[in-house]
């Protein structure tokens, strides 16, 4: 009987885990507000570069590959892209959390976002492919 109860409990736990998302999706509207911290150096609404490259359509892009920014990327960022770094959600999250740790030697002065919810929200904003 005790074995059956444990089995049923395990099944219920597995069902609940299967229903709940592994990681909460971010909120694009909240991400737009967080992205204000990035706007001094980056644009996400147009393909215009600023001090940093445009982040419009960054999700899925190979690191250091934006043609219009080639002469400004650090050697480290170009090497990261040549080594296969693609800006998927996981890599963007790691970079936003610790830019110098993810791509040592990159030029970005921003120290990173510490709040995981802010990171998820910025990624949701970038995935939404914001337009003016």
PLM regions: where:
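Bacterial N-terminal signal peptides that target proteins for export
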Residues: 1-10
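Bacterial N-terminal signal peptides
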Residues: 9-18
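Sec/Tat signal peptide C-region and signal peptidase I cleavage site
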Residues: 19-25
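Conserved Rossmann-like nucleotide-binding pocket used by diverse enzymes
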Residues: 20, 34, 109
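Sequence/structural segment immediately N-terminal to covalent heme-attachment motifs in c-type
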Residues: 25-50, 55
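Electron-transfer interface patches adjacent to heme c in soluble/periplasmic c-type cytochromes
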Residues: 44-46, 57-90, 110-120
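Short acidic/histidine-centered micro-motifs embedded in hydrophobic/aromatic stretches
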Residues: 54, 58, 125
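C-terminal capping alpha-helices of c-type cytochrome domains
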Residues: 86-132
């Amino acid at each position: 009987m005790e074995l059956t109860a444990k089995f049923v409990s395990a099944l219920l736990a597995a069902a609940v885990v299967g229903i709940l998302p592994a990681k909460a999706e971010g909120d694009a509207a909240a991400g737009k507000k967080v992205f204000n911290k990035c706007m001094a150096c980056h644009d996400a609404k147009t393909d215009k570069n600023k001090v940093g490259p445009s982040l419009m359509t960054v999700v899925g892009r190979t690191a250091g590959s934006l043609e219009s920014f080639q002469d400004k990327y650090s050697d480290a960022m170009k090497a990261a892209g040549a080594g296969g770094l693609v800006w998927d959600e996981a890599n963007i999250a790691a970079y936003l959390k610790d830019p110098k740790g993810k791509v040592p030697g990159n030029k970005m002065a921003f120290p990173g976002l510490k709040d995981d919810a802010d990171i998820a929200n910025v990624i949701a904003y970038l995935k939404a492919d914001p337009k003016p």
